Amino acid sequence: MNQREQSLAEQRTTVLQKADRKIWVTFRKEGIHRYPAAATDPALATGDEYDVSFLANPHRHMFHFRVWIDVWHNDRDIEFIQFKRWLENLYRDSTLSLDYKSCEMMADDLYGLIATRYPNRTIWIEVAEDGENGAVIQYNLTQPVLSIKL
């Protein structure tokens, strides 16, 4: 193996060892929420085709969750089927009654529960209304590196 090939092999090994490993799971839960400000905020209650004042009233969604969490090796120190079942059990009792909570607020609440059970891990949470519109929040322990020089 020449020097260039050796260098590239070492680089691949380093990248593999330092790889950011995550598992992800999905689950869904019915919920009812509302957005009180939609009734009075002129940017929302526009009176035209962009009017969303109806969001001030309680309305139903099927909330779709996708959760990513760090794992430390390829044998999965968090088994994703068990992780999914645990997450589903957090919401097993009836329909979610969320009042004014947004997708972002729901993600923050869920992050607190996950981080308590699985500390010291980067966690990303996506919450979507009916699988159409939603939010993703990345709860990073460290800020992502823009580039790595190997």
Mark where each language-model region is.
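Charge-rich, low-complexity N-terminal segments
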Residues: 2-150
